[in-house]
Amino acid sequence: MKEEKQLDLVIIGAGPAGLTAAIYAIRAKLNTLVLENELVGGQIRETYTVENFPGFNVISGADLADKMEEHAASIGVNIDQFSNIEKIKLSDDEKIIETEDVIYKVKALIIATGAKSRRLPIPEEEKLHGKVIHYCELCDGALYQGKDLVVVGGGNSAVEAAIFLTKYARNITIVHQFDYLQAQKYSQDELFKHKNVKIIWDSEIRNIVGENEIEKIVVENVKTKQKTELKADGVFVYIGYEPKTELFKDSININKWGYIETDENMETNIKGVFAAGDVRSKLIRQLTTAVSDGTVAALMAEKYIGGK
């Protein structure tokens, strides 16, 4: 039989939003637990360098995540890492989170589950994922020393990944569905300094032929419908993110893209249930906005609990 625990607050997710919320909650003397089924730090761990977070001119994403985790631990934040949630029941009157070992009955909940990389929409993605299709340049870039790579996407993540991969790859081809890059101008300028990078505009990958190695990559121009073939050793994909909201879709208002809808206080349609960070429906998703969301969510959770 599973153990039952009563808590003031559970925070699901230990990225920047979740850790910030936890720091504020502990300082407010709330009996708080953070549940995280992956590495503490979230997407920031996969970021090569962070240059727009106040207090650090340049810092690696992993180092910043470590500093956030250390800060949280230093004031007593309790993180149950690699904990999987099996069931969740949310209403105005009760909030129950069930993991493999424990049933938590809580007064308030903050959802900070973040988002995951959107998969390359081709038939071969599943069988080639982790072999020649990758989503993390920091994790897998070193495998391609002196080889040819394709990077898919044109936003900040794609451009910054391409810049990072130039230290390993012989040549890099960016395949982008538009005729312009959406990345920040600073990153674009850095990219264009590298002579071994070229861009195929208005195009998408349709197929990758091969079993354990790439034989050819079929690329289609989205305007002319003309197909061409590329040769490469690996493909790194950065075509946006999908929110991790599967657990909550039956109880919380979620928009058509899967993001949780909240008011300006981070509260969802259920009283006492808040959302923060990239999982929330909003215009801008940045490290600094995630931290801001976590702050507001924790303060409003404290106010909600105090009013019960």
UniProtKB/Swiss-Prot annotation:
Organism classification, top ranks? Bacteria, Bacillati, Bacillota, Clostridia, Eubacteriales
Cell cycle among keywords: no
GO cellular component term, pick one:
cytoplasm
Organism in which the protein naturally occurs: Clostridium pasteurianum
Under what name is this protein listed?
A: 34.2 kDa protein in rubredoxin operon
Q: Name one GO biological process term.
A: removal of superoxide radicals
Record-annotated residues binding FAD? T268, N269, I270, K271, G272, V273, F274, A275, A276, G277, D278
Spell out the molecular function terms from Gene Ontology. thioredoxin-disulfide reductase (NADPH) activity
**Which EC number applies?**
1.8.1.-
What is an example of a Pfam family matching this protein?
Pyr_redox_2
PANTHER family tied to this protein: THIOREDOXIN REDUCTASE 1-RELATED-RELATED
Give the family, as the similarity comment puts it: Belongs to the class-II pyridine nucleotide-disulfide oxidoreductase family.
